[in-house]
Regions:
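Conserved cytosolic headpiece of P-type ATPases
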Residues: 2-231
Length: 231
């Protein structure tokens, strides 16, 4: 069985295990988990869902753009300048205009980033095909647990972080996660532990999409433990 200590150790190292080691570490096999084991793992690791962060009001998000020591210093300088020379407010006004322009730009950038992240999270699929006790099932994606064996087919989004153990000309579009414009051909070979995320061609990550081919893989991370969940 794989306990909490094992899980912490291998969270960032799934790509450097070969297929046999991955099966062994997750205490699973190509026929998949039993329903009893699925229930145990769901109790331990929870549902395969991304938590929605608490939404901050637009006003608070805008005001937070001023939360910087340099901004505090400039605001103080502007106020002092107004108090000392109220008849010459030009410098103070200029400082306030610059601060407001910077805050507005930061607020806009933050909003764009939130929209992009929301769009990325919407790419998680609602159902997926899993093999349990040698039988293929179509199940809700939130029901996946570490150790589940999942089939990936062309046009489907990847439902969790998955270590690929069989690949049939499978290419995955990872642009939403890594920025790589070309689809990545997946393989099953182990990679050095230092391999960067964008170069881990034996992994398929939640929120990416199978562009061609098909594959079989083992769920290694779910929910907030996925690369997408950690963003």
């Amino acid at each position: 069985a794989f306990g909490s200590a094992d899980r912490v150790f291998i969270m960032s190292s799934w790509h450097d295990l070969n297929s046999e080691e991955t099966f062994h570490t997750l205490d699973t096999e190509l026929d998949g988990l039993t329903e009893q084991e699925v229930q145990k793992r769901r109790s331990r690791y929870g549902m395969n869902k991304l938590k929605e962060p608490e939404k901050t009001s637009s006003i608070l998000r805008f005001l937070s753009q001023y939360h910087d020591p340099l901004n505090y210093l400039l605001i103080t300088a502007a106020i002092v300048a107004l108090l000392i020379h109220p008849e010459q407010p030009g410098d103070a006004i200029f400082i306030f205009i610059v601060l407001t322009a910077n805050a507005t730009f930061g607020f806009w950038q933050e909003g764009q980033a939130e929209q992009a992240m929301d769009a990325l999270k919407q790419m998680s699929v609602s159902t997926c095909v899993v093999i349990r006790e040698g039988i293929e099932w179509s199940i809700p994606t939130p029901d996946l647990v570490p150790g589940d064996v999942v089939k990936l087919d062309e046009g489907l989004n990847v439902p969790a972080d998955i270590r690929v153990v069989e690949s049939y000309q499978c290419k995955v579009d990872e642009s939403s996660l890594t920025g790589e414009s070309n689809s990545i051909l997946k393989s099953t070979d182990a990679l050095p532990s230092s391999t960067l995320l964008a170069d881990r061609n034996n992994m398929a990550y939640m929120g990416t999409c199978v562009s061609t081919g098909r594959a079989i893989g083992i769920v290694v991370e779910t929910g907030m433990s996925t690369e997408l969940g950690r963003i």
